Design a protein with these regions (language model features):
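Active-/binding-site microenvironments in catalytic and ligand-binding cores
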Residues: 1-158
Length: 158
């Protein structure tokens, strides 16, 4: 039995504008993790208004200094007031720009690519803010490391 990703009106949870700031922040977190640690984007994410979490495959637990750097870098990028834009392109063209390894096999031949300035680009069906200035402040709540998986719990303070 699969996960139900729709709400009562049949819309995807990812298209819920009330979590757009958090969803865009998740993209910034993923891009920051890839840049800092060379790891893949989160293997598992749960994005909500009050708090969110993402899991990353890492060889070692990030230090307290690295965790502080992650938070600072994301807030620095938020403060750059970057435009968040959406483009539609062929799967072949998108494959030259973004990692499509997590894309379902039955995904459309035309993909929706979300760009956050020149900081991140990702295939995504979800709702996003129009500019990083709409996100608020990214705050790390807690983190844990077990069996090569680092879980980061975080929130956005509007």
């Amino acid at each position: 039995m699969g996960t139900n990703l729709t709400n009562m009106d049949g819309k995807s949870k990812f298209q819920d504008m009330s979590i757009a700031p958090q969803h865009t922040a998740e993209h910034l977190l993923n891009a920051t993790m890839v840049k800092m640690f060379g790891c893949p984007r989160s293997r598992n994410a749960h994005v909500e208004k009050k708090k969110s979490k993402c899991d990353y495959l890492l060889d070692a637990e990030p230090t307290a200094e690295q965790v502080a750097e992650i938070e600072a870098k994301i807030n620095e990028v938020i403060g750059q007031n970057l435009d968040v834009t959406i483009e539609f392109m062929s799967r072949e063209e998108a494959g030259r720009i973004v990692d499509l390894s997590k894309l379902p096999e039955d995904a459309s031949e035309t993909l929706r690519i979300v760009r956050i300035g020149d900081y991140d680009a990702c295939a995504c069906i979800g709702a996003h803010v129009g500019n990083t200035s709409e996100i608020g402040t990214f705050k790390v709540i807690s983190h844990s490391y077990e069996n090569g998986v680092w879980r980061l719990r975080w929130k956005v303070v509007l």
